[in-house]
Regions:
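Short beta-strand/loop segments at the ligand-binding rim of alpha/beta enzyme cores
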Residues: 228-238
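Active-site neighborhood of phospho(di)ester-bond hydrolases with catalytic His/Asp-centered motifs
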Residues: 109-110, 137-143, 166-173, 195-198, ...
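Beta-strand-turn-beta hairpins that frame and shape the catalytic cleft
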Residues: 85, 94-107, 192-193, 200-212, ...
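Membrane-embedded segments
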Residues: 83-85, 97-185, 190-193
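Conserved beta-sheet core of the metallophosphoesterase superfamily
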Residues: 159, 243-322, 326-327
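Extended active-site neighborhood of metal-dependent phosphoesterases/phosphodiesterases
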Residues: 67-68, 74-79, 91-93, 155-220, ...
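Acidic, histidine-bearing metal-coordination/catalytic regions of metal-dependent phosphoesterases
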Residues: 4-8, 19-105, 116
């Protein structure tokens, strides 16, 4: 027993000492690019156990004068999978969701850090589960690799998912520190869309939603959100690696932001989280949060690990979001 206690004390100390200091973050501008006209109905998930939905309080959306409200419910389902431990489901209802996108299913993954805790077998299991979940679109939040040699095998496997509306991703701090060009080139080679301060318009039956992505959010040169040029009438999803960006930078016209980076703390025991990859402490640690303008933000625990290949109390996860028209 004493050995176990000493081990976790040592682990917390190592993680705390090795924690990188948080940096200020930001974002530049963009134009709608791609149009897609049809999308088939999504099939229900068969292989995950059911869980009771947890009702979240009603929240507000855009930081403009007339602020529409959103209604959000969440449920968590554990899975028997070598890549992730659970799927976190959100039903996201908002007035700006077009009727044609009722039931639109978004899969969101982040921080694979391949190969860290996530190895080849786990990656294949993860992809099998993503295929089974049948998302209409796959969004990715960056920090993909732990070495340039892992870039091609990672995206080659992820490309097997083939969601009807495509695969979109932003890059994380690891990806700007190394392998940036390899990652962008490989993603594009496999038909994926890299959103470095770009937006893309998804169309269905004459209606649209917009996906916006942030270039290196730790670079102060990127302090203008790509959402600022968009219409407040559109439903806009902002994809960014770190949740701090949504608080530090004006992200007007954003209806929902998605982020990773925190790993959910990666190691959490008895309420103690020795590593917090955010200047805001536990405020944006994991799950549903809001910036000061009450813009909803979903932060995922991610999948892989950094510094040490261990997760305690912060399960690796896929986030699934289903959009609904709030009337």
């Amino acid at each position: 027993m004493k050995k176990a206690i000493y081990f976790f004390l040592l682990l917390f100390s190592v993680l705390f000492v090795s924690c990188k200091s948080a940096r200020n973050i930001s974002a530049t501008l963009s134009v709608a690019q791609k149009t897609l006209d049809t999308i088939p109905d999504s099939a229900p998930v068969q292989s995950v156990a059911t869980a009771d939905a947890v009702k979240e309080p009603q929240i507000t959306g855009k930081a403009d004068v007339a602020i529409p409200s959103a209604d959000i419910t969440r449920s968590i389902k554990n899975v028997n999978n070598k890549g992730v431990e659970r799927v976190v489901y959100y039903d996201f209802s908002h007035p700006d969701v077009p009727e044609s996108f009722e039931g639109f299913r978004i899969a969101f993954i982040s921080d694979l850090h391949y190969e860290s805790l996530l190895k080849e077998e786990g990656l294949k299991d993860l992809v099998r589960l993503l295929i089974e979940l049948k998302p209409d679109i796959l969004l990715m939040g960056g920090d993909y690799q732990e070495g340039c040699q892992f870039v091609k095998p990672l995206f080659k496997e992820i490309a097997r998912v083939h969601p009807p509306m495509g695969i979109y991703g932003v890059l994380g701090n690891n990806d700007y520190e190394r392998c940036h060009d390899d990652i962008v080139r490989t993603m594009e080679q496999y038909g994926m869309h890299v959103l470095e301060h770009k937006t893309d318009t998804l169309r269905k039956n004459g209606q649209q939603i917009i996906i916006a992505g942030v270039r290196d959010p730790f670079d102060r040169a990127n302090m203008k959100s790509p959402t600022l040029a968009l219409s407040p009438q559109d439903f806009v999803i902002l994809l960014v690696h770190t949740p701090d960006y949504v608080e530090d930078v004006c992200v007007n016209n954003t209806d929902l932001a998605l982020a990773g980076h925190t790993h959910g703390g990666q190691v959490r025991m008895l309420g103690v989280t020795p590593v917090l990859n955010s200047r805001y402490g536990k405020r944006f640690l994991t799950g549903l949060a809001y910036n000061s303008f009450r813009t909803p933000l979903i932060v995922t625990n991610g999948i892989g690990t950094s510094r040490m290949p261990i997760r305690v109390g912060a399960p690796a996860e896929i986030v699934m979001i289903t959009l609904h028209k709030l009337k």
